[in-house]
């Protein structure tokens, strides 16, 4: 294999000619069988076009054929339509041009979940809970997510008029928002916990700026007195491979430590990535949190830390995605994302789960708890060893050093979450109690969700015809209170750090991790 310490071009390459080759003479020359199959596809397309009972859309037929072809490969080789690819590019580039809000559609109304700090919407005073009732003097009732993107995003320097209904204020408020470049942060939260020594960093996904964001967060936390780190990769679906190894690099104590390697059919698919030594300054104990939703790049980071005994991994078995995709853009703005390699952790583990039973079962198994109660050595998985000789396992995600399951909410909680009723209740309560926003420390330590707020949540659920089953409500009452307080903190203070600071107060996985820093400290020596 070729040793590389730099971003590998094939992972993020823009290969405009790659798509065209699928229809070029190189493919046709590979054998008569391919020619026959292409002729068959062409015949079927013409036959459907000329004889189907309704007039079909040929482009949709071809897109369906492309999807069907890729489904024969693996669950992660996919076709991406132009509009979806445009948004994916914006997300992973780390910025887009627009007004700067996160939003949801609630009861058919466009509702601001939070203005992104420092953006045009934030500077104008738009708040969480504001309901956008008009865009450019046209009603926004019944608007779809795609229409929101179309109307609110646009070139920097252009403007859009919005009319807002604000809880607690009778008359609508008009704003003219001048669009700007909006950053998309992959570090969702970074703060010093209440004990004054534990840093908490949560990464949502691995985009083009993640390693710089994490490094800035670590430097800032060290100046605040951080002596140990809780790295939260739960529900992080992954992202760029180069960002995964660069983040892992931040936690390695010296140069030339293997971080991850890839194997594929071509020479450029076979790569090794090693530490650069820049992580030597971050010599504090580390605990990584993972769950069933931690995949791909998240597993590269947690696998490297675990294999080198750099820290502990706590939580649930990760998803188990050990495949690397290369995007091949097409001329119309769409793309095909093809699996070109498998990746392996430093000890040699391939953590990809089998996917021969179909995509639906593959996804379901990734979130299944089956087998987690059994001791690891009773499972039929390949055994590998860390630098210090600890046993770790391949073929089914990253197994945590200590399993702590996250509570599985009831169906009642799932319904309340899906309708964003916790947020809506918090926004209404914040409008009635603005005095709560004067001091976060007082809010964090002193505020308890009152019965009044719980009553309002139940009334809201009844109004929206969301069923509450009484024994499920009782079972999840602590979660309900924690979520309401977290959403209230976000609305009052417009700071996602504060939302997470509230939520982790009662987080079983976080609380268990805190008790295990003694072990993590021994590893860091």
How should each PLM-predicted stretch be described?
Residues 25-37, 41, 45-53, 57-58, ...:
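Cleft-lining beta-strand/loop regions that shape enzyme active-site pockets
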Residues 1-5:
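Positively charged n-region of N-terminal signal peptides that target proteins for export
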Residues 297, 309, 316, 320-382:
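Polar, glycine-rich mid-to-C-terminal structural blocks
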Residues 350-351, 355-525:
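Conserved functional hotspot residues or short segments at active or partner-binding sites
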Residues 135-136, 165, 339, 354, ...:
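Residue-level recognition of conserved beta-strand edge/terminus positions
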Residues 52-113, 159-189, 256, 503-514, ...:
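Extended, small/polar residue-biased N-terminal targeting/export presequences
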Residues 8-23:
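Hydrophobic membrane-insertion alpha-helices, especially the h-region
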């Amino acid at each position: 294999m070729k040793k590389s310490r730099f971003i590998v071009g094939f992972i993020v390459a823009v290969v405009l000619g790659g798509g065209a080759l699928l229809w070029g003479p190189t493919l046709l020359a590979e054998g008569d069988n391919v020619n026959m199959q292409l002729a068959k596809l062409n015949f079927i397309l013409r036959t459907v076009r000329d004889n189907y009972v309704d007039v079909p859309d040929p482009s949709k037929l071809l897109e369906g054929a492309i999807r069907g072809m890729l489904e024969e490969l693996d669950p992660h080789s996919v076709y991406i339509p132009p509009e979806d690819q445009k948004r994916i590019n914006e997300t992973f580039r780390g910025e887009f041009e627009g007004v700067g809000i996160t939003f949801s559609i609630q009861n058919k109304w466009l509702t601001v979940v939070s203005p992104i700090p420092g953006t045009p919407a934030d500077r104008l005073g738009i708040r969480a809970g504001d309901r956008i009732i008009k865009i450019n003097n046209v009603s926004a009732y019944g608007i779809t997510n795609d229409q929101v993107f179309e109307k609110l995003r646009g070139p920097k320097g252009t403007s859009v008029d919005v009319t807002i209904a604000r809880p607690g204020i009778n008359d609508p408020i008009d704003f003219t928002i001048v669009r700007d470049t909006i950053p998309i942060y992959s570090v969702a939260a970074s703060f010093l916990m209440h004990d004054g020594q534990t840093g908490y960093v949560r990464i949502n996904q691995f985009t083009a700026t993640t390693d710089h964001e994490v490094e800035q967060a670590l430097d800032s936390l060290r100046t605040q007195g951080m002596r140990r780190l809780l790295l939260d990769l739960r529900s992080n679906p992954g992202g760029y491979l180069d960002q995964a190894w660069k983040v892992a690099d931040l936690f390695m104590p010296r140069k030339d430590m293997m971080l991850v390697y890839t194997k594929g059919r071509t020479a450029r698919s076979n790569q090794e990535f090693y530490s650069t030594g820049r992580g030597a300054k971050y010599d504090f104990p580390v605990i990584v949190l993972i769950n069933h939703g931690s995949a791909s790049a998240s597993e590269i980071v947690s696998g490297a830390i675990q294999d080198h005994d750099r820290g502990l991994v706590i939580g649930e078995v990760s998803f188990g995605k050990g495949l690397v995709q290369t995007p091949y853009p097409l001329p119309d703005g769409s793309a095909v994302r093809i699996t070109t390699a498998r990746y392996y952790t430093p000890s040699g583990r391939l953590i990809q789960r089998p996917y021969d039973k179909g995509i639906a079962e593959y996804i379901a198994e990734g979130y299944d708890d089956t087998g987690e109660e059994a001791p690891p050595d009773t499972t039929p998985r390949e055994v590998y060893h860390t630098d210090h000789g600890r046993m770790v396992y391949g073929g089914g995600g990253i197994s945590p050093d200590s399993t702590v399951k996250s509570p599985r909410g009831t169906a009642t909680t799932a319904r309340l979450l899906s309708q964003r009723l916790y947020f809506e209740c918090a926004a209404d309560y914040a409008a009635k109690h603005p005095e709560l926003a004067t001091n976060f420390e007082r809010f964090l330590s002193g505020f308890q969700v009152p019965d009044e707020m719980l009553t309002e949540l139940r009334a809201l659920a009844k109004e929206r015809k969301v069923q509450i089953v009484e024994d499920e409500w009782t079972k999840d009452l602590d979660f309900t209170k924690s979520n309401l307080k977290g959403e209230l903190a976000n609305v009052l203070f417009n700071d996602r750090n504060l939302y997470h600071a509230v939520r982790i107060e009662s987080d079983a996985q976080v609380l268990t991790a805190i008790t295990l820093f003694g072990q993590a400290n021994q590893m860091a020596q």
